[in-house]
Amino acid sequence: FMNWRLYWMFSGGNVTENMIHQIAWIMSALDLPLPSAAYMSGGIFSEKDGREVPDTMSVTLDFPETVVTWQSTFNNRRYGLGQKLLGSDGTIEYVAGATDMVKGESEEQIHYYPEKVNRPNGVAITGNSPTHNHMQNWIDCMRSRKTPNAPTELGYRSAVAAHMANLSYRQKRRVTLEEAKAFQPEY
């Protein structure tokens, strides 16, 4: 079945397909625990193809000392893929370009832009993404028994955040971690 991703029975939509990976980067950088609450709003505004999962969404994840937001839409590619970590000392931006289908590589870069108010002498930096060789890191860690760049615990926390977001969307309300733990699906 080609478009299984469009239906709740088979998929969590773009939240479990993409947000889970993008949120992992932020959760890792900030060493965040499980979110205490999640809220997701959105709808089917662009892709009128019979899908059940939203094509446009905005997710807010509450953590003890910060809030993380994630947005996605299928009807505008102006800003491409990427994440921005906005802090009082500056912004770290992870930019993912299109994958070269011949080389199997994507143009990924990380940029740091200092916040001039708090870091007047800060210097902007551009570097390569540490996830560029993500699969190679995973294979190397199987051989060496070292911890991979994206350990299992990080995947778990990211998955919980994604499922909380979808639960919020489907219930049309903010969902706490405790409510998500107690949730029993009807199927």
Residue ranges, per PLM feature:
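Contiguous beta-strand/loop segments that form the cofactor/metal-binding neighborhood of enzyme cores
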Residues: 1-12, 16-153, 159-187
